[in-house]
UniProtKB/Swiss-Prot annotation:
Role noted for this protein: Has been proposed to be a redox modulator.
GO cellular component: plasma membrane
Name of the protein described by the UniProt record: Putative membrane-bound redox modulator Alx
Gene (name only): alx
The species this protein was found in: Shigella flexneri
Family annotation (Pfam families): TerC
Lineage: Bacteria, Pseudomonadati, Pseudomonadota, Gammaproteobacteria, Enterobacterales
Family of the protein in this entry: Belongs to the TerC family.
Topological domains annotated Cytoplasmic: 28-43, 111-113, 157-198, 247-261, 308-320
Main location: membrane
Amino acid sequence: MNTVGTPLLWGGFAVVVAIMLAIDLLLQGRRGAHAMTMKQAAAWSLVWVTLSLLFNAAFWWYLVQTEGRAVADPQALAFLTGYLIEKSLAVDNVFVWLMLFSYFSVPAALQRRVLVYGVLGAIVLRTIMIFTGSWLISQFDWILYIFGAFLLFTGVKMALAHEDESGIGDKPLVRWLRGHLRMTDTIDNEHFFVRKNGLLYATPLMLVLILVELSDVIFAVDSIPAIFAVTTDPFIVLTSNLFAILGLRAMYFLLAGVAERFSMLKYGLAVILVFIGIKMLIVDFYHIPIAVSLGVVFGILVMTFIINAWVNYRHDKQRG
């Protein structure tokens, strides 16, 4: 697997992530089971975005010093594009979490605890998926065509899909988990497991955590191939992906109260997936530069938010 990642870059990335996670977990322990306020969510979102951009700047500077601008510029652009793709696709993941918490009636104060472990699990699972994907691409480059076709299909499916939280309990996976886990009927404070009559029982909070992890894996199947369309370098794919999901918990609490105001977002994300799928399928005929890909993704997001604002304005005017 060809990569610009040196031991210094890998080590620096690991240290930054470890320190930030330690700070986040320490603050979580001090606050206990309290919901993150909108102000705190906005502050943490800004911290994670700023940290990601600073890392990319340091990454670019390091490559300028060691490889030159000809290498540094496209690699830094690849990181930024991958980060933007993952960050935008992660919003749909957040909306699924909202449906899960709503369906299982998880109090806001306990949602934070679930998401702490959910994000930690996502880091481990995505790291495994990215290195596996990088190895497969290095051995079988035709897999990129499969990724492209899959993203094209997923984009169309996303645009046509109708999300309904009322059927979550009837999903085969949920029924299977409930049938195979010894589980209580009610949430017991912040506990994932409780003891009754000497036996260990999972609580519904544990079921929600499992579903949060599985939903992230499902979304990673979309987002990780999307970043491979930009670069196959495992260092850039992993760092851009993990920096994007590290801010997911803060993003969740930032968007939780206004999710219904983003009705058009899934269509914008669907267009992004279709564009990336086409980019992967035509790579042998025409190579779309990274800067163009970044511009297209950013442009689609801007247009989506403009259309969304217009739709919200029309709805508010009709209600008003």
